[in-house]
Amino acid sequence: MDGQDIGAGGGCPFSGANTNKGRRSNRDWWPNQLNLSILHQHQARQNPLGETFNYAEAFKSLDLDAVKKDLIALMTDSQDWWPADYGHYGGLMIRMAWHSAGTYRTADGRGGASTGTQRFAPLNSWPDNGNLDKARMLLWPIKKKYGNALSWADLMILAGNCAIESMGLKPFGFGGGRADVWEPEEDIYWGAEDEWLATSDHAQARYSGDRVLEDPLAAVQMGLIYVNPEGPDGNPDPIASGRDIRETFARMAMNDEETVALTAGGHTFGKAHGNGPVDAVGPEPEAAPIEAMGQGWLSSHKSGKGVDTITSGIEGAWTPNPIQWDMGYFDVLFGYDWELTKSPAGAWIWHAKDLKEDDHAPEVDGSGKKVPIMMTTADMAMKMDPIYGPISKRFHENPEEFAEAFKRAWFKLTHRDMGPKACYLGADVPDEDLIWQDPLPAVDHALIEEADIASLKADILASGLSVQDLVYVAWSSASTFRGSDKRGGANGARIRLAPQKDWEVNEPAKLEKVLNALEGIQSSFNAAASGGKKVSLADLIVLAGSAAVEKAAKDAGFDVTVPFTPGRTDATDEQTDVESFDVMEPQIDGFRNYAPKKFSVSTEEMLVDKAQLLTLSAPEMTVLVGGLRAIGANYGDSAHGVLTSRKGQLTNDFFVNVLDLGTKWTATDDSGEIFEGADRATGEVKWTGTRADLIFGSNSQLRALSEVYAQDDNAGKMVADFVKAWVKVMELDRFDLK
């Protein structure tokens, strides 16, 4: 091909064979198709660093002090292509780090800074992330220098830390260990709106009723990190803004004091940009022309940078000295009355009445010119809201308390999605254990050995507890884990503590019976063991489930040993933040066939969502559901999906019978949630099932997987694969083993 073979119409010479442009995908044809692709993201083969690359090991070779020195030097090394405001990039870097971390939400643990996805769509092109592409490009020489030992995810947060330090406040600490991913995270639901910054009157709005925000969302509009700084839907009402702020920050794991500290502390630095018409701003990075080379929001307004920059449309600094940690934010917030006005870009802002010359901010270009400061409607809520106002007053009167509160809130903001402190790397990790890190006691005793494990398994199976109950409790304990923010899991045995012990899905009466029996076995063993050897309840819960799986397999004719590694410890009530665990209570769980009510999202979609949080592949999800159904580990001992006459045995009967062409399935009512499977010949009802069961025969991909496990030659493979996937779930939070 010489480039001269394109027809007069300019068509593609490959007839679209190698491009998606103009081609309808399966999802276009069938919008309701179950999205299993979220179970196969971020595979090792997609990592350009290689399948064996270990970021934690690479990070250990990093000279962290040298990196910080380079970052602090960068702050004042202004570049002509994107000059630093006031000669200091600190405000820009803080905003970049904040917006990297600020997508986190507690409901599903998704979002946050731990994977570096601000580099990719949609986040790299969100309206609220305007011009942060410049911040990352400014960091490229440092990333280039330190290479594989410093991820983008870590670098963005560390840059924010160094920005704060370079402007006069030593941060609380820094933990490295955020490994980059190499594609967008498609599992995150950002909202149903089909336009950026859609307001609450949009047809697909995230609000309903009296401004009730849809779960699991936290941000108020599509494309915003937190709230609209101009006020709800752009309405400049500080009291209404306070309500939005409280709800949004709570959904991002922040209480009222942390919210005030972050808002006031963050706005002590830098400025907002809106010194020109918004229609002068070019397209975001994902829509920009190829020659823009990844840059977006290129502006045709005058120079398009520095004084002339347009980002949010809001214009001005919050404080008289935007590159210094001080009490300037509260000084001016409480020192003046404020009046509503508009920026040159037309955004609502507030200006101080009769602003003193000394309280003006310098112009960003170093010309010596003085310009007015401003506040946003969200800032005014820090003064006018009946809860935020008194907190702000207290911080204003107690500068050291304010500084400490900001440092701690910033550390929480930037580390909330990293999991327990065991996941933190580097010399700057604070010694203090923080309640939001879900701390665990250290292992202070000798661990059980092979002979002890065998003896304990025998005691468990002789206790009178059923295989189903042992499997159910172990699964309930371990399956709280979320790969999104690395919370939950079996370590800590928090299933015996509030709130988990009272969760409906955990069947409190059954749970109490099992825990009482296991605690008796634990007490007897620990009292008799020599050499300081002990078994934790967390270990015993998992061991009990493993023993039950072995028995279920043996009863089905398969001798297997479920691998078990001791070393879990038991958390205390004092180490458990009940409120923060409340949001983790399952409202539906397809693995346990628990569905107390119908949701707007289908049962099968929620099953896949749960599997994704458990970091399972589609085959792993499939074999686990089939095995749990065969064992009978259903909520309430329900018969739904227990498609076997050998309940309690680890067989492939679920797959054989869900694919049985002699069975006709019919919904029991209009909800389409429960089904009866009748013999086609006699009409006799043989089985009942839920959508979480029938999907394994209905969905073409899951049916293909089910066929593998239903084959006559794969009954043993099904058992082996179940055991492997079971152990994976039991050890998801064993960061000490990784």
From Swiss-Prot:
The keyword Oxidoreductase applies. One of its GO terms (cellular component) is cytosol. Signal peptide: none annotated. Belongs to the peroxidase family. Peroxidase/catalase subfamily. The gene is katG. GO terms for molecular function: catalase activity; heme binding; metal ion binding. Keywords: Heme, Hydrogen peroxide, Iron, Metal-binding, Oxidoreductase, Peroxidase. Its EC number is 1.11.1.21. This is Catalase-peroxidase. Its cofactor is heme b. Coiled coil: none annotated. PROSITE patterns: PEROXIDASE_2, PEROXIDASE_4. The record marks R95 as: Transition state stabilizer. Heme b binds at H267. Binds 1 heme b (iron(II)-protoporphyrin IX) group per dimer. It comes from Ruegeria sp. (strain TM1040) (Silicibacter sp.). Bifunctional enzyme with both catalase and broad-spectrum peroxidase activity.
